[in-house]
């Protein structure tokens, strides 16, 4: 049987990782850490899921490691006695206050030592599994790929038999949506109750005395948006209704993204994509572009068109007869300016792209995507 040891925080990501490992046939040992965190309710939630798994005849060894005396001397808003937990978007600058210095290096070091011990005792290979993901990279340096590459190298140099253990980080390039999709699949394979398992988790950095999530910390916002992206209501208990926490999360996301767009885009790009404006004909940089390559959304880098789909319509705006198969461009009825038209918007970030008309090449279905140059970014294909 395959063997794994992992850090089970009691949050969404590590819980999803646990059910994935079990679905993949691993025998799993879990370590949870008590380090003086304000949201220690996560440890109770972790134990609830271990107990639920036992009722389903799935046995997982679970140990809680007490690091309070060591880590309570660290400075972080996440630790008892630290400053108040900031609210807002999970990528906002103020969320750096929730970084606990060197936390993941400490956790990984203990896991590595435990994995070596299991490998020696059971004479087997052991995977060290962690649920870190791309959404953590912006704020938490110890969740980035280069950190784990360096840590694994250092630990291998400092231990005998290091060839028997290795890191397994399946979500490193994914996000919370990726994680939830994976958990849905894993719980289905195992015949487990997805809602019950994720009701028994805590992601909030500032739950109330009853363990209910605030819905306002950066971690909450990211989780709420992930559930909503999949058309799901989060089964965890919040201090207010799901509709209220979702409305707040969507507004926080909108404001954060708008601030980002204002900083990054030119005035015309912002006007076109975020205010549904239109550039003047024959003024955009791509209306007569002839090079081979791909066209991406200027706001979110989502692939929209390829140069093979572009044609010269003579209208003064970039014209395409087909969208990329994975573009999923949204079509929206537009009755502005006394006209009836079909607006096209990016499916990923809702950027206004232009309009679609029925005067395109018949050989390709007769449609013409009339796109603002300001809404797209062209990347030339290397020969």
Where on the chain are the PLM-derived regions?
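Short, surface-exposed acidic
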Residues: 59-61, 190-201, 267-273
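Local cysteine-cluster metal-coordination motifs and their immediate loop/turn environment
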Residues: 109, 203-225, 295-304, 350-351, ...
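ATP-dependent adenylation/nucleotidyltransferase module used to activate substrates
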Residues: 1-194, 220
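Iron-sulfur (Fe-S) cluster-binding segments and ferredoxin-like electron-carrier domains
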Residues: 212-245, 304-313, 354-355, 374-382
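Short linear capping/connector segments at secondary-structure termini
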Residues: 131-134, 204, 278
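A short Gly-Trp-Pro
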Residues: 253-383
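Accessory C-terminal segments flanking Radical SAM cores
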Residues: 182, 186-229, 234
């Amino acid at each position: 049987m395959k063997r794994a040891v992992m850090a089970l925080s009691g949050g969404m990501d590590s819980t999803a990782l646990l059910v994935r490992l079990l679905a993949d046939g691993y025998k799993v040992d879990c370590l949870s850490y008590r380090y003086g965190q304000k949201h220690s309710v996560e440890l109770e939630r972790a134990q609830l899921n271990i107990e639920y798994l036992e009722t389903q005849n799935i046995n997982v060894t679970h140990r809680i490691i007490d690091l309070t005396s060591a880590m309570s001397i660290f400075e972080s808003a996440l630790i008892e006695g630290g400053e108040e937990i900031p609210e807002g978007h999970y990528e906002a600058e103020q969320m750096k206050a929730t970084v606990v210095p060197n936390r993941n290096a400490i956790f990984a070091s203990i896991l590595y030592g435990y994995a070596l011990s299991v490998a020696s005792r059971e004479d087997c290979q052991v995977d060290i599994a962690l649920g870190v993901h791309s959404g953590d990279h912006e704020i938490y340096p110890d969740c980035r790929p280069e950190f784990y590459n360096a840590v694994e190298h250092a630990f291998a140099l400092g231990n005998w038999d290091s060839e028997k253990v290795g890191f397994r980080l399946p979500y490193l390039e994914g996000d919370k949506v990726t994680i939830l999709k994976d958990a849905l699949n894993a719980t289905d394979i195992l015949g487990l109750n997805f809602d019950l398992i994720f009701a028994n988790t805590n992601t909030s950095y500032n739950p109330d005395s009853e363990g209910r999530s605030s819905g306002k910390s950066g971690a909450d916002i990211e989780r709420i948006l992930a559930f909503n992206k999949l058309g799901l209501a989060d089964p965890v208990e919040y201090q207010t209704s799901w509709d209220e926490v979702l409305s707040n999360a969507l507004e926080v996301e909108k404001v954060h993204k708008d601030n980002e767009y204002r900083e990054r885009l030119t005035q015309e790009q912002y006007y076109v994509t975020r205010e549904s404006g239109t550039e003047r004909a024959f003024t955009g940089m791509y209306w007569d572009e002839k090079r081979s390559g791909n066209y991406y959304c200027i706001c979110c880098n989502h692939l929209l068109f390829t140069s093979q789909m572009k044609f010269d319509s003579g209208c003064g705006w970039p014209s395409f007869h087909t969208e990329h198969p994975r573009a999923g461009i949204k079509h929206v009825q537009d009755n502005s300016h006394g006209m009836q038209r079909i607006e096209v918007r990016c499916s990923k970030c809702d950027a206004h792209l232009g309009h679609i008309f029925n005067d395109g090449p018949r050989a390709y279905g007769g449609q013409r995507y009339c796109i603002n140059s300001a809404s797209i970014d062209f990347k030339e294909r290397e020969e």
